[in-house]
Amino acid sequence: MTATGNALAQKWALAASAGATATYNHYTGANQPQDGFVACLSAALGIHSGQAGRLKVNGTVGANELLCTGGQGNSFAPSVALTANLEAIEKFFFIDATANVSESFITPFGPQPSNLTVPTNNRYISQTYSVSPYIQGVIAPNISYTLRDDNVWTPSASYGDSSAKTPTTYLNNLSGQMSSVVGNGGGWTLQYSRQSYDNGVDTGTYVIQVGRAIGSYAVNPQLTLSLRGGYESDRFPALSGDNGALLASSSNSGVIYGGGFNWRPTERTAVDGYWEHRFFGSSYNWQLSHRLPNIALSANFTRGLSTFPQLALTIPGGITVAQFLDAAFTTRIPDPVQRAAAVAQFLAQTGLPPTLASPLNFYDQSITLQQTASVSAVWAGIRNALGFTLFNSRTDEISGTGSALPSVVQFGASNTQTGGGVNYSHRLSGFTNLVASAIYAVTKPTNTGGTPGNVRSNNFNTFVSVNTQLAPKTSGSVGLSYFTFDTPGASNNGSTSTVSVYATVTHNF
């Protein structure tokens, strides 16, 4: 191998690990399985290509359950989170690609145990793959452009002995943007996007085309105001059910108008967002963030159209704790590369769960109107770390006229998810941590006919564990978890619950 080849090879880093877990589950409630042990093997391979070179690949490939005895039909639970970027033509043509595979749930109205050894017919293997070629460049000193073609596929597979899975969907989003920045942050932006959604069931596709012009004015270095206007043309296909077509195809076109602002009162505080009027009413996206030396706070409020593959791509596994730690460490570690390494080290040392609680992304045949509010915070101390989040997310299927679909064709999809979660880690010694987590979520129907029985569901997951380093490359943990699910008001047999005791050993190669 040449010296250049050696240099390139050294940029790639692989990290393999393998583990074994033994779990004893005690079940309470009607129609529950017998108590028993479940033994599982797991494996993972981490890939990090570094930031140099034209091809960058980062992420992990593995299985949370590679081989199990007992459990839900000797289940296989893959876990993949990969991102790749190829600079095909220097500083001009790029290709982004992602692959995410994890275990998820069909409906928020069903049981959602976080412990994979607790069986449920609501669980399936969710897969999301995307390929996005794009070009970008500068055509004048202050004018830049981007043309991007996002392609997202969401195949799925059943988990264990359950037959539940979602149809394969496809989303294409062709978007272009040209913008200019002048003065202290003012300027203009031209945008166009054409989104096409194939739900994998109906023969037609949903098409949404939007063109916008945005003008911004910098009042001062801290505040920028903007006005936005445009036009949209949408096409919704006919929806079909058991008895044929239930809702004819529809189309809509109209003017878009609105405004927004970006406000930076201090270097640690930011308020950004916009409001628009569209065919379904108000559309908005507001974000508030603030950081202290050890704390990162964030609040988000959104309302707009969305699709199942869109959400599967943007939030495949929940809100990551790493992004909050990155903000909290910004003051102490200005360099982004060193800060990323510090975040990874902190997560490894504390054993803090990598994600915060978030609403369940579930399959839906139509484009939906999503209205979401969330508040999150992460505190990173010397011996303690704490993360919490609260969320409320309302989902409504809508027609091309902007009104809600009749309940007969909503398939139980219109609902409101409300919940929250807290993660806590305490360092007992240099090699041992106490970790605890609790997540509670309530799902309610938002119409009188979209959900069988018109019931709500309650899901509660919690665990506490002690993690320790047994050897330089070997770690172990013991823990206790509890899960309960019930549907108040339904004609069921009461709540069900599971208490689990487990022990895990993991070795890094």
What positions do the PLM features span?
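Gram-negative and organellar
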Residues: 2-509
